[in-house]
Amino acid sequence: MNPQAKLIFTISLLMGTTITISSNHWVMAWAGLEINTLAILPLISKSHHPRAIEAATKYFLTQAAASALVLFSSMTNAWYTGQWDITQLTHPTSCLVLTTAIAMKLGLVPFHFWFPEVLQGSSLTTGLLLSTIMKLPPIALLYMTSNTLNPTLLTSMAILSAALGGWMGLNQTQIRKILAFSSISHLGWMTIIIVYNPKLTLLNFYLYALMTMAVFLTLNSINTLKLSTLMTTWTKTPALSAMLFLTLLSLAGLPPLTGFLPKWLIIQELTKQNMALAAVALSILSLLGLFFYLRLAYCATITLPPHTTNHMKLWHTNKPTSSSISILTTVSTTLLPISPLISTMI
């Protein structure tokens, strides 16, 4: 793709995200979502591969339907209340339609089927954008309307997302699909707490974005898309493979790594809200995700590829690791000691 075109699409992506998260009017928020959608489509289909074109088409159809539902929800609310303010969403039908629309945009169960297919048809850098930046505007809308949404509906969607995100990722061999189901599972944790402590949802999203960026950039650096090729990477970049191992365990939520912090705080908040059963369900369902994270980590660092010589190292010099990957992997694994400070800030 032309560098100038890529720059224009990236700026449009940032502009659409900024418009949505900073607006109070429904039409402006909708316009920001549309700018985002139109900016990401060329980035998804830039390889001109049939899978990429198919992914872009699926993404466009899903996001167009979700955007239409957002507009319909805001118009229904304005019809009954005379308000276009995002925080004044009070009509029950509008709340229900908006929840459905945002679930479609995020890829929450039962509207999740498009996300793994789109991520599989995209490059790793575009997949990173789809998993992080593209989820920020819908989560911002959830944050702004959290006090009027239906807790029972959101809790049901969240537990189903955590269950299916873990369960459907078990038999995957494509790394992008595994990361897509990982994203669906993490969205379940973010969604269940949005009504009770919205700031905790944002903290969870920020930490998830950091860890996911570290994983995607590492995989992009070692040019790995399948589990079978992941098994041979540690001979080329042993230090990077070791950090990938720790980052994957952090994504799984194992202490004493960064990913344990949001899960710990969410379980604590759910217990305070007399939702101990939901907390137990999420904790048990996270074991499904732990299995495929361990599978990835095992392939990245422990298994040995078939070899016929005693020399495992390649003869050529490896490229230096990007400083951004080093910083992201460090943050993704070492934030837990300052968790008391972080928990008092939210």
List where the protein language model places each region:
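Core, highly hydrophobic multi-pass alpha-helical transmembrane subunits of bioenergetic inner membranes
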Residues: 1-346
